[in-house]
Amino acid sequence: ISLEKYEIEEITYSRIVDESDFQSENLQVSVKSGLTEDKKYGKVTLEAKFFDKEKNKKVSARISGYYTINVEEDSENYIAINGTAILYPYLRSAISMISTLDSQDAVLIPTINVLSILENQEEWRIFVMYYLQR
């Protein structure tokens, strides 16, 4: 697959005042992926929420990547796994850059095991999109 472009759809950075804002996990990542009907193009959307209890920071972001697909077999899984692996560093970088505008302490979200994230995500479904806006 080849990444054609990516778009940051939403990014939020805030200082946390209330303890109830903190989640049990520091990092939550969700993935959605889809293909055009002809399976030549794909889209992956990553959403991440990161909570830094020590520094009272919360960052959330949603980013989408648009891909050209050049494999024919198992393209649904291919776009979900490889598309996520390609896009995730862009998400990490955007979160880090936004957090450095506030202080010298950049928020660095950890790397992930893509297969583990996809296996553990209950609502994750591969779906075919009949129209993919490019």
Role assignments for model-derived ranges:
Residues 1-86, 93-134:
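N-terminal intrinsically disordered, cationic/polar leader segments
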